[in-house]
Amino acid sequence: MIPSRKQPLVLLAEDFEDARELYRDYLQFSGFDVETANNGREAITRAVELQPDLILMDASMPVLDGWQATRELKANPVTRHIPILALTAHAFDDARREARAVGCDGFVTKPCLPDDLVTKVRAALDNGRKKSKR
């Protein structure tokens, strides 16, 4: 987290507008600053520009899917340190394996309860802080 920030910044990459607004509202209500992206390409651009503390990345998006966007973010020295949580409706083990394979730091199955989302985001932020102190 950038020290001058009062609240952790979460970049939410989700192409479905209703879901994007719902998750954004959950997170803002819980004390996070939230910026959004509509597709994987926009998520990469915004991540480089904003340097968020965490990215919630929908797996299935137009232009560039979340898996490829995650690969590119983890390959870039400017963004590889940012924790990424996969956000997907696919709860199967294959989706979890794919998330790990592309570099995601965690997995959130949607729809999810607001408290579950916030708990996973906080846990990923805590894990990211621990890694950065090593």
Model regions: which residues?
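Active-site beta3 strand of CheY-like receiver
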Residues: 50-56
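Charged docking surfaces used in two-component/phosphorelay signaling
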Residues: 21-29
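Short hydrophobic/Thr-rich beta-strand motif most characteristic of the beta2 strand and flanking loop
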Residues: 31-38, 46
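Conserved acidic carboxylate
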Residues: 14
